[in-house]
Amino acid sequence: MDIGQSLGEIALFKGLPDDQLSDLASIALIKRYHRLSTIFSEGEPGSGFYVLLAGRVKIFKLSPDGKEQILHIFGPGEPFGEVPVFEGRSFPAHAETLENSTAVYFPRTEFVSLIKRNPSLALNMLAVLSRRLRTFTVLVDNLSLKEVPGRLAAHLLYLSQHNQGTENVELDISKGQLASLLGTIPETLSRILSRLSKQGYIESDGRHIRILDRTALEELAEGIRRL
């Protein structure tokens, strides 16, 4: 695998000249994980961060009674565990693979040294952190201010937006994982999907969802409409 070429195709490193990509490749370590492997646990020292090349990874917190709250699910090309790189602190959550996965690992000390020498790399990291902050702001808003139907509607619209605005979306995680991501339980999620279908807002066939009434979903997501 040509690490430098692979890094150049990742949004985080887009636009960097070849010499900077070579510098990144020189400190990068390829790590491969089987499905359901722990990459790091909450409280472990944040000694570096990762960029996913293949597979999917969930970031989650555990309550004292063991209940899981999924914070984010990352796919190929996305960085994770990057906040401790700048803070020099421990990982604030757990990371586990959902399928066989390959990631590039960047040790904190070496990466920070590269950033100090390369302002363009620092700007790219700042853009990533800004997007991540917006994502978690939406998550907090959804969990604290919206009812479950609104959270689900917002998630379906998010999937549509990230699939070029198509009306057909696919749930790429299990309903149990989606329920955790939305802060509910699988039984409640199934009931809401059924109600959305009966109202004519969506068609549901397993993991395949077709949006029939985008306006209704938008109003649900915004709290204007109730299910």
Which residue ranges define each predicted feature?
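Phosphate-/nucleic-acid-contacting segments
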Residues: V148, L159-L227
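Cyclic nucleotide-binding regulatory module and flanking cytosolic helices
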Residues: M1-I30, H34-R35, P79, P84-V85
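Cyclic-nucleotide recognition modules
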Residues: H72-A127, R134
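Short, small/polar residue-rich loop motifs at catalytic or cofactor-binding pockets
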Residues: A25-S26, E44-G46
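Glycine- and acidic-residue-biased ligand/ion/polar-headgroup-sensing regions
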Residues: L36, S47-F60, G75-G77
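Short phosphate-coordinating micro-motif centered on Lys-Gly-acidic
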Residues: T38-E44
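Polybasic "coupling" helices that flank or enter modular domains
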Residues: L98-E99, K116-P186
